[in-house]
């Protein structure tokens, strides 16, 4: 018997089929160091048994007729194409008339004709990580040998366009490219990207015993990684691009943050958890079946359990996860809750970790 999610919104769990394994070593990547949590496990790849178990349970837990699978990394394309073909076979096996959609995030460097044929044929949406023009992108996005990745990413994007694959850009805003908002924005228009997600990089330093350096909420430290964008930079970056976009590009180019802000303004669901009053509806499952509260909270204290010992419903509608979601608002300082702009930004104290005065509010 299927156990259904008790609320109307879909159960959403991001999959990490290779964990933190990646062919790049981007300086600011928050996920690379997660491999230290699994240093005793020799192979960081999702096996067929776990893949089938997750797909069956994930589909059977849904109340909606449309079901979205999201594949994330690490670098997702380090799993062979056969793995994703197998995933689609299993999705159809357990779909029982429901519509299945897939989206996949990639750094773009491993895309080939064969990959793009598959993505187009099966209508997969692709997210490509690219940080603007070459001089910005290559500053932090390099491979393990220190070589730049921009040229390979652009070759991948060319292939996506060649085969007509739908794709959007996930662009990290850091201490370097934040000072050039129009150059950054115009680059995406020049390469034909109409859907853009801007993500500010804000990482605090906390030295863990196992070698991890990034802090989570509750690990009180004001020290930031050097690549972190400042509040002033982030504010100027958004305002400058917004002025350009609202005067020239509305309806032609779509910027996720602006769409979400408008949704908040008119009382609609913003569609992204970072812009919601509460969160906790989007978890993540690692390559071995471990489940965490959020993709940005893969820390031991935010582990909900393992799919082999607990159901997805038990984990995501249990007290621990519900409290996690409510704390996004509860932990805000009074100054943020009383701010006239709160409705617009729904500041994400959970993500930045600045619980005394949120980082966003300073910009």
What are these regions (language model features)?
Residues 141-151, 158, 162-274, 278, ...:
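Radical SAM enzyme [4Fe-4S]-AdoMet core and its adjacent flexible, acidic
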Residues 13, 279-281:
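Short loop/turn microsegments at loop-to-beta-strand junctions
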Residues 298-363:
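Flexible mid-to-C-terminal extensions adjoining Fe-S/redox cofactors in radical SAM and related proteins
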Residues 40-45, 139-147, 355-356:
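Short glycine-enriched, charge-decorated loop/helix-capping segments at active-site entrances
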Residues 22, 26-29, 273, 279, ...:
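Short cysteine clusters
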Residues 55-56, 78-197, 204-206:
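Conserved AdoMet/S-adenosylmethionine-binding subsite of the radical SAM
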Residues 1-117, 121-122:
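Conserved alpha-helical substructure of the radical SAM core
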């Amino acid at each position: 018997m299927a156990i259904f999610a008790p609320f109307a919104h879909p159960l959403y769990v991001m999959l990490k089929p290779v964990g933190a394994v990646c062919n790049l070593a981007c300086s600011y990547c928050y996920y690379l160091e997660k491999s230290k949590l699994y240093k005793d496990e020799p192979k960081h790849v999702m096996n067929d048994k776990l893949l089938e178990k997750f797909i069956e349970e994930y589909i059977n837990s849904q109340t909606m007729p449309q079901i979205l699978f999201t594949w994330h990394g690490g670098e997702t394309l380090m799993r062979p194409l056969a793995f994703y073909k197998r995933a689609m076979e299993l999705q159809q096996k357990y779909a029982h008339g429901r519509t299945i959609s897939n989206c996949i995030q990639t750094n773009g460097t491993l895309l080939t004709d064969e990959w793009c044929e598959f993505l187009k044929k099966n209508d997969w949406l692709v997210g490509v990580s690219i940080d603007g023009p070459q001089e910005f992108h290559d500053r932090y996005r390099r491979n393990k040998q220190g070589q730049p990745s921009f040229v390979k990413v652009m070759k991948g994007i060319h292939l996506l366009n060649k085969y007509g694959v739908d794709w959007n850009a996930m662009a990290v805003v850091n201490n370097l490219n934040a000072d050039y908002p129009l150059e950054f924005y115009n680059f995406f228009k020049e390469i034909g990207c109409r859907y853009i997600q801007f993500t500010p990089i804000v990482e605090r330093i906390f030295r863990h015993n196992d070698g991890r350096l990034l802090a989570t909420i509750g690990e009180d430290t004001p020290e930031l990684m050097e690549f972190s964008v400042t509040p002033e930079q982030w504010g100027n970056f958004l305002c400058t691009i917004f002025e350009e976009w609202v005067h020239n590009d509305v309806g032609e180019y779509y910027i996720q943050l602006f769409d979400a802000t408008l949704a908040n303004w008119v009382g609609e669901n913003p569609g992204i958890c970072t812009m919601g009053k509460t969160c906790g509806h989007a978890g993540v499952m690692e390559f071995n079946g471990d489940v965490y509260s959020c993709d940005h909270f893969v820390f031991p204290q935010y582990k909900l359990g393992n799919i082999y010992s607990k159901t997805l419903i038990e984990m995501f509608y249990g007290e621990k996860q519900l409290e996690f979601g409510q704390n996004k608002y509860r932990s805000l300082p009074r100054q943020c809750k009383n701010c006239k702009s709160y409705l617009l930004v729904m500041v994400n104290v959970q993500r930045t970790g600045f619980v005394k005065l949120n980082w966003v509010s300073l910009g």
